[in-house]
C-alpha cells in the first residue's frame, strides 16, 4: 500500500531532491564557462586568485564569485591531478559552502569535493580548516590537494602529532590547514594555557570542513578532550574496594545492560556498609550520607568494572595495562583512559598496576569546540540517520548527494538463526562458497572476541586463507585493507576499522606502490614496476567484477544503523557491483536486549528446525525499530550531557576571553586597582554590616583581614572609637593606605617590572583557581542527580550552584591577586617565565587508536638533531618522525623499526 507521503514525494520530489535541484543552475553556469576557463594559460589561471581577492576587497561576497571560483578549481584539478570534478561533486561543494553536511557514498571523491569550497572560502584570508580523523589522512590529503592550492597561489599547512609550536603556528597561518580533530582541540586548549599572545598557535575559527563528520561530531561527542596533570596515588583504596565485589551475591545488585548502569540493592547496601565499616572507610552511619559521596563513587565504579565491562570486548590486558577497545572500530586505544576513576577500577579488577588519577587542567567537547567556528560543514557516507542530531545541536542540514553512477550493490534481507553456533556455521559456508567463486569477502564483526572466534572456527575447518583486521593487529591494517578487494580475499574486520581507506576491487594501487616500491628510487626500473602493478590490478579487478564484486557479510547488527550502513557502503563503490548480507542469531547482544525471548517462542511455534534461518523483510523492520530506540536513547544522553557542558562552556569562554585580554594588555594596573578596591569593599561590608550600630562593628576581624590580605598593620580599633566615623570613612582610609603602599612598591620596581609582575600574578592565579573550579564542577555534576529524588530539576540546580561557584572563583581571584601583589618583593635574579605544569592529553581516536595520552612538552625538549643522537641510546633520540630513517642505523624506517614499539 502506497502512503500519501509516498505519492507526494513521487509527484514533487523529497525536500532533499528539491535542495539538490536548487544547485543545478549554478552547475549549468559553471559548465557554461568551462571551455573559456580551459583556454587560460597556467599563469592566467593562477592569477584568478588575485582577481577574486580584489573583488572581495571591493565588497563582493563569496557567493558572488562562487561560479568562476568553482570553475577555476575544477580546471586546476584537471591540470594538476588529472581529475575533473563531476557535476554531482560540484553540488557537493556547494552544499559544503552553504553550512551543511554532504552525504556522499564511499568512493564518490569527497576529498576532491572539499577543494571547491575550501578554495572559495580561503580567498577571504581568514583561514580554512579541513578536519580529518587521523594524521595519515591529514598528511595524505594535504600533500595531494595542496598541489591544486599551490598551483592557484595558495599556501597549505598540515598539523600532526609531534610538531613544534613554531611549525604549528606556520601551518595555521597558511590559507588552508589540514589537521585532525584532536590536534585542533588540544591546540585550542594549550593556547589558552599560554602566558604570551605571541606563543599562541591558532589564529581564529573561520570555516571548518569536517571529514567523517558523523564519527567526530556524533561518536566522539560524549568524550571531552582533556589536558590533565597527576594527582596523589590512591591504588590501595581501589584494591580494597575491588575485593568487596566478589563477596556480593547476585541479589545484592541490579544490572541494566540497556542503560549501562549498575546499582546496589538494599541487601547489598547493608553488606557493603559492614565491609566498609570493618575497613575503616565508612563515615557516619549510612553509605549514602553526604560525607560518603566519594566512597559511593568508587564502589559503583568497582561494580561496573566487574559486571558491565567485559575483557576482550570492552578492553584487553596488554603489557600489564588495561587498554580500551573502541566500540565503533574495534581498535585498541592505548592512549585513552576512562575518566572519574573507572579505569583505575578496571586495573584493580585485572590485578595490574594502578595508574594514578589525573586532575583536569583544561577540557572541551567537540560539540562546543566546533560550534565556535563562524561557519561549519561536513562530509560523510552516512549521516541521514543522525540528521535530527546534526540539526538540533550543530544547526547543520544533511543533504544526500546523488552518486555519479547508479549503485549496483544488492542488499539482501537478514538471515536470523536461533544460536551463535548455527549462525557461524552458515557464515563459514557462505564465505567458503564465495572464496571458491573468487569473490572478495569482507566479514564485519562487533568485537575482537567475535572476530577471533570466527577465525578459529575457520581454521578448524582447514581454511587459513584469510586476514584478521582488529585491535590486536592494527600495525598491518593499511595493507590488509588495500588487499581486501583482491579476488578470493577473505578479510575479517572489527566494525569499521580502516575507514579512511577505500576497498578497491583488484587492490589499492597507491598502497601497493608505497609498500612494494617505497624504497626504490625514481627511474626507468621503478616506472616499469609501477606499470606492471597497474596491469596486474586491472586484471584482478576484472576477475573480482566477474565474481560479483565485494561481498560484505555482517555477523551482527550494531546498535546504530549508521554503523551498519557504513559496513554495507564498503561494497559497490563508484558503480561497481556488490552484495551485502547480515547474519544474526537470537543470542546477539541487540536481539537479547530487545526481547529475543518472544521471537524465540514465535519461531518455535512456526516449527523452525536447527540450522534453519528465517528471512523476511519484517525481521529487518523490527530490528531497525530496535536500533532506532537505541539511537534515540544515545541522542538523549548526548543532548543532556551537552546541556550540562554548556554551563561549563559559558564559564570557559569568559575565562579564556579574560586571559586573552590580559595577554594583549601591556598595562593592567587599572584592573589590579579595581580588584583591590572591590576587596576592600568586601572586607568593610563583611565586618561592618549594613545599618549596624558602631558597637556591633567587628574591629578585630577587620584588622585581621586587612593584615592577611592587604599586608597592612593599621590602627583600626582606634578608628572605630572616633566620634562620628562611618563605614565610608573606614573604606576611604583603607583604600588610601593600600594605594599608598602599592604606589611605593611600584615606584621601587619601576613601571616595566611592575606591569610584568601584575600580569604574571593575575594569570597564574586565574589558572590555578580555574583548575580547582573544574574539579569542583566535576564533583558537583557527579552528585547533582540525587536532587531529582527531592523533586528538583538537577540541571537547574546544577546551573544555579555552578553560577555560585563561578562567583566564588571571581571573588577568590580578586582576593588572592591583591594578597600576592601586596606581599611581592623583588629578588636579584632575572624573572622566570611562568610555566604550565607537566600535562597529559587524551581522547578517544576511533580511527587510528593512536596514543593521545602522551606528555606534552615544549618542542625544544623533544626535537633532537640527527648529529646529536646516539644510535645505541634511544633516550637521546627525542621525537623521531614515523617515516624518518631509524636512528639505530638499521636502514629501516623508524615506524618499521624501533617506532613499531610505540603503539604496543
UniProtKB/Swiss-Prot annotation:
This is Protein translocase subunit SecA. Gene3D superfamilies: 3.10.450.50, Helical scaffold and wing domains of SecA, P-loop containing nucleotide triphosphate hydrolases, SecA, preprotein cross-linking domain. InterPro entries: Helicase_ATP-bd (IPR014001), P-loop_NTPase (IPR027417), SEC_C_motif (IPR004027), SecA (IPR000185), SecA_CS (IPR020937), SecA_DEAD (IPR011115), SecA_motor_DEAD (IPR014018), SecA_preprotein_X-link_dom (IPR011130). It catalyses: ATP + H2O + cellular proteinSide 1 = ADP + phosphate + cellular proteinSide 2. Belongs to the SecA family. Monomer and homodimer. Part of the essential Sec protein translocation apparatus which comprises SecA, SecYEG and auxiliary proteins SecDF-YajC and YidC. It is found in: Cell inner membrane; Cytoplasm. Part of the Sec protein translocase complex. Interacts with the SecYEG preprotein conducting channel. Has a central role in coupling the hydrolysis of ATP to the transfer of proteins into and across the cell membrane, serving both as a receptor for the preprotein-SecB complex and as an ATP-driven molecular motor driving the stepwise translocation of polypeptide chains across the membrane. GO terms for molecular function: ATP binding; metal ion binding; protein-exporting ATPase activity. Keywords: ATP-binding, Cell inner membrane, Cell membrane, Cytoplasm, Membrane, Metal-binding, Nucleotide-binding, Protein transport, Translocase, Translocation, Transport, Zinc. Its main location: membrane. Its cofactor is Zn(2+). The lineage of its organism: Bacteria, Pseudomonadati, Pseudomonadota, Alphaproteobacteria, Hyphomicrobiales. Zn(2+) binds at residues 886, 888, 897-898. CDD domains: DEXDc_SecA, SF2_C_secA. May bind 1 zinc ion per subunit. The keyword Repressor does not apply.
